[in-house]
């Protein structure tokens, strides 16, 4: 069971480990975070069996401080529209079923999509309990971040968000295999090989978040669910209630998270995304030993231990664990954030890599990878992506908006060549100027010499948006001006004029897409064009292949 002299993950030895008494930590109150304060305050989209284990966790490992009875926040009750706009009625699209879980701010239900019969989880957050503007922003930001990260195979996929007079409903894929937390309790600790595989998944999520300008801030085993109870590696990160967007070098000061996992710089109120790597290091230590590296009988005692940073590698089972594993933990739990491994460096560590072989090159930054994909598209597909981008909701593109603002350093509303070059290099790119110029020209569809906001969104939007029928149909109808069901040469020419596209051979566009050689493009041919060459289109889409190295930016780590 690991180091039983200092407590266990099951809480069978030291109750002080399981329930810290000192609640002096001023952790952030966040209504959209289902698991951020108590393991029984759970919005997780899981099965009944998992939810029934919550009373057990209250007596096994309380990882966070209790909520304050009152909040010292200013602000009025929530705005009428938390999401800022009207949405369809969720009951027109889904049938809500049995309750999966109950939290302080709402309830998670099983829901069934009326049109397909597919099952999802619906987290319904009570608007009555959103008592300040900050509460509203927390919920709105969680939805934005879930949309921004959608497509990564180890992050729960958001299906949609809806609002009625009483609730905000977040519909997402259902994960019925239980929590990683419960697996740790059942096993005590994992073998090194299994722990390495799980760490690769968890740190892969961290890298994906950081690469897209998101800091998680509350990683812990309860926030990872299993899609399939028979597969330990079918992990999904499920709770982004404390997550925030960040820019390279940005410093955060609010103390949030969970005591056993919190990084020392968070307690010192001066931190950035490297705090997530510390937290992942704590999880790795627990996976291998069954106990947290920093433990005490009170919450303040835990914080004191974190600030001292002493890691116990002497007690059982550490003498039997490889030096390579210990080396990785030391480098993830380095007290100096600037000297701590980045998420990408963790994934390249010999203990993590299969057969001890690290990747021979850095992965492309996400924005760079998407720009490369965009540059290879034909003119019609580029215009169609612009049309689709303009139809996306605010919450779907909020993350890309933040990235655009980070690159548009003079706030002109357009990214120049120098800004694109500086932005890509700040985020980890090593492209030559000529290569950056080629990407610039590809994204600058209207040949203005800069990339405006609409062009940036079109060029960097995740291609999983092309799965959605309503987006494809809307784009097709944009080009099919006369509603004939076909896109003709004249209609392509008209669209090019509207988008200020020059040097376009209209007949060549038609010829490339027209599969039946009738001189026009029908809807099926249009869809085939839009999905051709999209890597891993569908639920298998991995954003690991689209890594934006904000983690490597000066001042970000």
Curated annotation (Swiss-Prot):
CDD domains noted in UniProt: STKc_CAMK (cd05117)
Bias kind Low complexity: ranges: 28-48
EC number: 2.7.11.1
Cross-referenced SUPFAM superfamilies: EF-hand, Protein kinase-like (PK-like)
Catalyzed reaction equations: L-seryl-[protein] + ATP = O-phospho-L-seryl-[protein] + ADP + H(+); L-threonyl-[protein] + ATP = O-phospho-L-threonyl-[protein] + ADP + H(+)
Residues annotated for Ca(2+) 4 binding in this entry: 514, 516, 518, 520, 525
Keyword terms, alphabetized: ATP-binding, Calcium, Kinase, Lipoprotein, Membrane, Metal-binding, Myristate, Nucleotide-binding, Phosphoprotein, Repeat, Serine/threonine-protein kinase, Transferase
Extent of Polar residues compositional bias: 15-27
Region spans: Disordered: 1-72
GO biological process, one term: intracellular signal transduction
Annotated binding of Ca(2+) 3, by residue: 480, 482, 484, 486, 491
Superkingdom of origin organism: Eukaryota
Domain Protein kinase: 94-352
Entry's Gene Ontology cellular component terms: cytoplasm; membrane; nucleus
Catalytic site positions: 218
Binding positions (Ca(2+) 2): 444, 446, 448, 450, 455
PANTHER family attached to this UniProt entry: SERINE/THREONINE-PROTEIN KINASE
Function: Regulates the production of reactive oxygen species (ROS) by NADPH oxidase.
Family: Belongs to the protein kinase superfamily. Ser/Thr protein kinase family. CDPK subfamily.
Protein name: Calcium-dependent protein kinase 4
């Amino acid at each position: 069971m690991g180091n039983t002299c200092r407590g266990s993950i099951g809480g069978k030895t030291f109750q002080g480990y399981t329930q810290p008494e000192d609640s002096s930590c001023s952790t952030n109150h966040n209504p959209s975070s289902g698991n951020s304060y108590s393991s029984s305050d759970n919005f997780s989209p899981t099965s009944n069996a998992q939810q029934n284990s919550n009373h057990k966790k209250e007596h096994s490992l309380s990882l966070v401080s209790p909520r304050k009875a009152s909040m010292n926040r200013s602000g009025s009750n929530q705005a009428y529209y938390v999401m800022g706009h009207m949405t369809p009625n969720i009951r027109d699209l889904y049938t809500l079923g049995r309750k999966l879980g109950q939290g302080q701010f709402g309830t998670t239900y099983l829901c069934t999509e009326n049109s397909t019969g597919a099952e999802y989880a619906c987290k319904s957050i009570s608007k009555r309990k959103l008592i300040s503007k900050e509460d509203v922003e927390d919920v709105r930001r969680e939805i934005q971040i879930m949309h921004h990260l959608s497509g990564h195979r180890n992050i729960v996929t958001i299906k949609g968000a809806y609002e009625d007079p009483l609730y905000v409903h977040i519909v997402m894929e259902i994960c019925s295999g239980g929590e990683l937390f419960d697996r740790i309790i059942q096993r005590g600790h994992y073998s090194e090989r299994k722990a390495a595989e799980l760490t690769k998944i968890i740190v892969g999520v961290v890298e994906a978040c950081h690469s897209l300008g998101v800091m998680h801030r509350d990683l812990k085993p309860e926030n990872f669910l299993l899609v399939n109870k028979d597969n330990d590696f079918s992990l999904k990160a499920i709770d982004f209630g404390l997550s925030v967007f960040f820019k390279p070098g940005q410093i955060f000061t609010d103390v949030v998270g969970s005591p056993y996992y919190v990084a020392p710089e968070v307690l010192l109120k001066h931190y950035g995304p490297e705090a997530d790597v510390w937290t992942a290091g704590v999880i790795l230590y627990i996976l291998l030993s069954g106990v947290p590296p920093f433990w005490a009988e009170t919450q303040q005692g835990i914080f004191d231990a974190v600030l001292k940073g002493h890691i116990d590698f002497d007690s059982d089972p550490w003498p039997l664990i490889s030096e390579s594993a210990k080396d990785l933990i030391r480098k993830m739990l380095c007290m100096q954030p600037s000297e701590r491994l980045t998420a990408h460096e963790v994934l390249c560590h010999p203990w993590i890599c299969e057969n001890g072989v690290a990747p021979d090159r850095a992965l492309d930054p996400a924005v760079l990878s998407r720009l490369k994909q965009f540059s290879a598209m034909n003119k019609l597909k580029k215009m169609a992506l612009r049309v689709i981008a303009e139809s996306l909701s605010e919450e779907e593109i909020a993350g890309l908006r933040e990235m655009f603002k980070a690159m548009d350093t003079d706030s002109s509303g357009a990214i120049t060549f120098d800004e694109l070059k500086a932005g890509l290099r700040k985020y980890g790119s090593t492209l030559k100027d000529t290569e950056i110029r080629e990407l610039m020209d590809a994204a600058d569809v209207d040949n203005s010499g800069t990339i405006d906001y609409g062009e940036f969104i079109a060029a960097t939007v995740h291609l999983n948006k092309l799965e959605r029928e309503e987006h494809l149909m809307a784009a097709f109808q944009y080009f099919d001006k006369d509603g004939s069901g076909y896109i003709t040469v004249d209609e392509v020419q008209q669209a090019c004029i509207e988008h200020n596209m020059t040097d376009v051979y209209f007949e060549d566009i038609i010829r490339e897409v027209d599969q039946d050689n009738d001189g026009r493009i029908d809807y099926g041919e249009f869809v085939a064009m839009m999905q051709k060459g999209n890597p891993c289109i569908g639920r298998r889409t991995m954003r690991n292949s689209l890594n934006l190295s904000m983690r490597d930016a000066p001042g970000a780590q």
